[in-house]
């Protein structure tokens, strides 16, 4: 785990997918301690094998021009094999569970405690104004404003004591959660 930051992406909405896919994703991410787990709903991209199969089956609900670019204007762009409401509910529930502040902090803390110190040492430099602003935002939101502030400070000081070489990265990854 030295120098590698694990990230994982999960897609929900496949044909043949059984109920509970979202919970299985949450369970996997929790058991493995992956700090950054991205979730998405399946989209059929134009001119792919999936697109052609769904087109042949009459299941596409979006034409090719609408399917280009950002695929975040609808849940799925095809008719799934199980109810779309179930898929959407599982997606939202899984996402909210993964990024619930306590669960997210627990995963990030556990992960960075296990990380070894980087072998390559960069040259030390003073933080930029952007770095100072970002740190201030994290401290304000996570260390003062939220009800998770006790956990934040416990984990921050724990990381500083037990794995100081990873403290900066720990804070950076905690900050990533600020856009959710």
What do the PLM-derived regions correspond to, one by one?
Residues 132-180:
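Terminal or standalone catalytic/regulatory effector modules within metabolic enzymes
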């Amino acid at each position: 785990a030295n120098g590698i930051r694990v990230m994982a992406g999960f897609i929900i909405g496949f044909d043949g997918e059984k109920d509970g896919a979202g919970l299985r994703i949450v369970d996997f991410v929790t058991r493995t301690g992956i700090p950054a787990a991205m979730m998405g709903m399946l989209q059929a991209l134009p001119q792919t094998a999936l697109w052609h199969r769904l087109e042949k089956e009459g299941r596409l609900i979006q034409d090719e021009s609408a399917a280009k670019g950002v695929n975040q204007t609808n849940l799925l762009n095809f008719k799934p094999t199980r109810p779309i409401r179930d898929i959407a509910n599982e997606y939202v529930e899984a996402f909210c569970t993964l990024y619930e502040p306590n669960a997210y902090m627990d995963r990030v803390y556990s992960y960075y405690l296990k990380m070894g110190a980087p072998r390559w040492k960069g040259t030390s430099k003073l933080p930029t104004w952007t770095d100072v602003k970002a740190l201030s935002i994290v401290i304000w939101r996570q260390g003062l404003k939220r009800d998770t502030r006790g956990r934040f400070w416990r984990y921050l000081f724990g990381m500083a004591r037990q794995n100081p070489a990873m403290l900066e990265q720990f804070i950076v990854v905690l900050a990533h959660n600020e856009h959710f």
